[in-house]
A protein has these predicted regions:
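Low-complexity, acidic Ser/Thr/Pro-rich repeat tracts that form intrinsically disordered stalk/linker regions
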Residues: 2-7, 40-160
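Sec-dependent N-terminal signal peptides of Gram-positive bacterial secreted proteins and lipoproteins
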Residues: 19-40
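Aromatic- and acidic-residue-enriched carbohydrate-binding clefts of CAZyme catalytic domains
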Residues: 161-163, 204-260, 277-310, 341-366
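Catalytic domains of carbohydrate-active enzymes, especially glycoside hydrolases
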Residues: 181-204
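An active-site-proximal structural segment forming one wall of the substrate-binding cleft
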Residues: 252-273, 302-334
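Substrate-binding groove of N-acetylhexosamine-processing glycoside hydrolases
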Residues: 312-316, 320-326, 331-332, 362-526
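Amphipathic, non-membrane alpha-helical rod segments
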Residues: 534-588
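Conserved small/polar residues in nucleotide/adenosyl-binding loops
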Residues: 590-592
Length: 592
């Protein structure tokens, strides 16, 4: 942080570094033995009113001890001016957000674009208002629109909700999870009606290794065994997990196939340019000099220096390697992009990247934010070249709602986890939709950090997550600016900020169950018990009376004729049919 006696502090407020990471939007609806109907998730869904989502304040805030310099004062004033100018455009907000066609907006990013100012504003998550888009949509309706029968309309709404992605995210980058543990999570995901497992394999640690890890970059090829040793050591330097270092390629392939058989998709994450401690350590082992971002003498342990061409080239080649493996196995690949150098900048990383525009030649990264946009778009291009959909966390995308630096690839699905906090001024979900991005709601109101199992045990504790789920529905997208935000699904997340903390399956499953129960209309009903009940009907009915056989057959027929697109909110329909079948079988045994 110190260089030549100059200390940068971008605001007067205390800065907090909130950890999250989480991610994805899926592939498959939960399968069911009976024939399923095809449903669509493309429509806009009005969001109900909900309580305001509380923004995170970590349990161990890092207060700045540095005095405020004149340069920071000017930066804050410039930010305030920007806010006042932007407020004028919010008066005529349309409640239902649709992507805009940008004709004269920011240029496609190049290495010569111009940065933008930092804003300082307190952001709290705003919750969508239900049904407010209805009046605006009616303008385009025919004079005598066709009206669906009520039952058909309800069925359509149910199918649209069931088509949304329901994802559970596991931080298997910081902490090692065994294949058996992950399969158990997949089983529970199937049982509760989820569609996908979001698996962070690269998040601070890197805990997934391919058979061939050779990397070609910087005019040379790094041998596979050398890369493996370097990454394994890099992960152990981050946290030497006694339970294991990484998953192998065969284990991952088996896991993907296991999930597919259950109707569950898998969404991998390899995070960069931040949260890549192990990769940075590995690069140094392989002879790449100074790969870490350095902020006025303070080195980030987890973030790559975007000005280090060798380090950036190696990272891109590594992402390309993993994307090639996941091609045709998964649908979405999360490239991360969150929290740039928060550890070295006191959570001011994005502001630091944008600062050079206003204070050139003062040591800030030259065109730093333009380089970040170019980097993000390069990763998106790499992922798309393998037939995958890129996804990334929201905080760095159009930071400070500034679009003058360049344009992010619209194909990047935005995992919207935060509305920001004091001095961490992220773009609204409304703006991101207008810029053409799909939104996966990853609201941090639903977060749980392993080991923080009750109130009083730190931010993102389990009680906080459970209460957040109860009070914040799946439709409540962070920082909506009063608009109804179209979203492709929701993701609940379990993080391992303290990787040594014990993993408790029962606590994770409690979180997953609460998310499903609180949003029951969006989750598929559990048909497994119905299938089991049918399988338990005696095969030989010759010993039973004709009346008993008829009763059993009729009860079984009711189960087989059940609508295969029932939601978890309609689980009683299935359970009652099962109870009647079991009762019929029991009475048959009595009458033998």
């Amino acid at each position: 942080m110190y260089q030549g006696g100059f200390i940068m502090k971008l605001d007067k407020k205390q800065r907090f570094s909130i950890r999250k990471y989480a991610v994805g939007a899926t592939s498959v609806l939960i399968g069911f033995t009976f024939s399923a109907q095809v449903v669509s998730a493309d429509g806009l869904t009005p969001a109900p009113k909900a309580t305001e989502t509380l923004q995170a304040v970590p349990d161990s805030p890092q207060a700045s001890e540095a005095p405020i310099q004149d340069k920071e004062e000017k930066l804050v004033k410039q930010a305030d001016k920007t806010i006042k100018e932007e407020v004028k455009t919010e008066k005529d907000t349309v409640n239902t957000v649709v992507p805009k066609t940008d004709n004269a907006v920011a240029p496609v990013v190049t290495e010569h674009a111009s940065p933008a100012p930092t804003t300082e504003s307190e952001n709290t998550t705003q919750v969508e208002k239900s049904g407010e888009s209805a009046n605006t949509e009616k303008k385009n309706e025919p004079a005598t629109p066709a009206v669906l029968a009520p039952t058909t309309e309800r069925a359509t709404q149910t199918n649209e909700k069931l088509a949304k992605k329901k994802i559970v995210s596991i931080d298997a980058g910081r902490k090692y999870f065994s294949p058996e543990q992950l399969k158990e999570i997949i089983d529970k995901a199937k049982h509760y009606g989820y569609t996908d497992l979001h698996l962070l394999v690269g998040n601070d640690g890197l805990r997934f290794m391919l058979d061939d890890m050779s990397i070609t970059a910087n005019g040379k090829t790094y041998a596979s065994d050398d890369v493996k040793r370097a990454i394994e050591k890099g992960t152990n330097d981050y946290y030497n997990d006694p339970n294991g270092n990484h998953l192998t390629e065969s284990q991952m392939t088996d896991l993907i196939n296991y999930a597919k058989d259950k109707g569950i998709g898998l969404i991998p994450t390899v995070n960069s340019p931040g949260h890549m401690d192990a990769i940075l350590n590995a690069m140094k082992e392989l002879g790449i000099q100074n790969p870490n971002f350095n902020y006025f003498g303070k080195e980030s342990a987890r973030t790559v220096d975007l000005d280090n061409e060798q380090a950036v080239a190696f990272t891109k080649a590594l992402i390309d390697k993993y994307a090639a493996y996941f091609a045709k196995k998964t649908e979405i690949f999360n490239i991360g992009l969150d929290e740039y150098a928060n550890d070295a900048t006191n959570a001011k990383g994005w502001s630091v990247l944008q600062a050079d525009k206003y204070y050139p030649n003062e040591g800030y990264p030259v065109k730093g934010y333009e380089k970040f946009i170019a980097y993000a778009n390069d990763l998106a291009r790499i992922v798309k070249s393998h037939g995958l959909k890129p996804m990334a966390f929201n905080d760095g995308i159009y930071y400070n709602s500034d679009t003058s630096f360049g344009t992010f690839d619209k194909d990047i699905i935005v995992s919207m986890w935060t509305g920001g906090w004091g001095g961490y001024d992220v773009a609204s979900s409304k703006l991101l939709v207008e810029k053409g991005h799909q939104i996966l709601n990853t609201n941090d109101a639903w977060y749980y950090v392993l080991g923080r199992n009750a109130d009083g045990q730190g931010w993102y504790n389990l009680d906080q997550g459970l209460n957040g789920i109860k009070n914040t529905p799946i439709t409540s997208v962070p920082k909506s600016d009063g608009a109804t935000i179209p979203f492709i699904g929701g993701m609940v997340a379990a993080w391992a900020d303290t990787p040594s903390a014990r993993y408790s399956p029962s606590r994770l499953f409690k979180l997953m169950r609460q998310f499903a129960n609180s949003n029951a209309e969006y989750f598929a009903a559990d048909y497994e018990s119905a299938e089991q009940a049918l399988n338990e009907v005696p095969k030989d009915l010759n010993r039973y009376t004709a009346e008993s056989v008829a009763a059993v057959n009729e009860a079984a027929k009711v189960i087989r004729s059940l609508d295969s697109n029932l939601s978890r909110a309609q689980q009683d329909t299935i359970d009652q049919a099962i109870a009647k079948l079991q009762e019929a079988v029991s009475l048959s045994l009595i009458h033998i």
